[in-house]
Amino acid sequence: MQLRKLTTAMLVMGLSAGLAHAEDGAPAAGSTLDKIAKNGVIVVGHRESSVPFSYYDNQQKVVGYSQDYSNAIVEAVKKKLNKPDLQVKLIPITSQNRIPLLQNGTFDFECGSTTNNLERQKQAAFSDTIFVVGTRLLTKKGGDIKDFPDLKGKAVVVTSGTTSEILLHKLNEEQKMGMRIISAKDHGDSFRTLESGRAVAFMMDDALLAGERAKAKKPDNWEIVGKPQSQEAYGCMLRKNDPEFKKLMDDTIAQAQTSGEAEKWFDKWFKNPIPPKNLNMNFELSDEMKALFKAPNDKALN
């Protein structure tokens, strides 16, 4: 009788220990990490022309400041799942399709140039912030456009599906500016619209505008002007209600930022020559970015 009780107790203890171990090590059922573990592949969304955040270089390799975060997160997933040979699949996304493709499971997360705001939080979750930007204008140097009021009655281009597009339409309506707003497919198309003379200015996040200027045939012909219409926080985007995966992403980002690694990434992409033309964006680390690196957070700024 005593032996039977002892055996039963040992079985119960063993089962409890096994469950506890499963809870500690195995990802929650239905989570992104569970999906990755079962499929043996992590699918990462990336941008094609968001210089210098996430874009193709001369060899069609995906590179950039945000891509460095993305790569660090992939390595953290491999370590978490104990899968050093985990297959990594990269798929290109746009401002228009990034949220639907995330929601339907086409990709698992993306680090690009996606603004974390309260409206988007209804559709997706965001990691700790990786970059802080201001929304301004790219225009021809020495031209008539110096600030947003100068856009009255003019053609202005903006990238479709972005927060800048929403802001520009709101400004046009509230200020009765009579602008003709052109919505382009991606940032590259937006700049080509500006370069061809079909628009007098390109409204977008200042760091992205600096990236488009760096890609131009004659970068010195273009300047970034105007009082910022908003301050925005870029975050890596993941599906809602997945605290385990968000924690992994946040921990990875915080480690990079507080250790000084993220500042090295910034210097590499914003203060040194970068592909495809080895041009230097000459973009300084802002006070907002310095504060972020000291105290990582996932706060939406708008």
Curated annotation (Swiss-Prot):
One of its GO terms (cellular component) is outer membrane-bounded periplasmic space. Transmembrane segments: none annotated. This is Glutamate/aspartate import solute-binding protein. Keywords: Amino-acid transport, Periplasm, Signal, Transport. Its main location: periplasm. It is found in: Periplasm. Gene3D superfamilies: Periplasmic binding protein-like II. The lineage of its organism: Bacteria, Pseudomonadati, Pseudomonadota, Gammaproteobacteria, Enterobacterales. The complex is composed of two ATP-binding proteins (GltL), two transmembrane proteins (GltJ and GltK) and a solute-binding protein (GltI). Residues 1-22 form the signal peptide. It comes from Salmonella typhimurium (strain LT2 / SGSC1412 / ATCC 700720). One of its GO terms (biological process) is amino acid transport. Part of the ABC transporter complex GltIJKL involved in glutamate and aspartate uptake. Binds to both glutamate and aspartate. Belongs to the bacterial solute-binding protein 3 family.
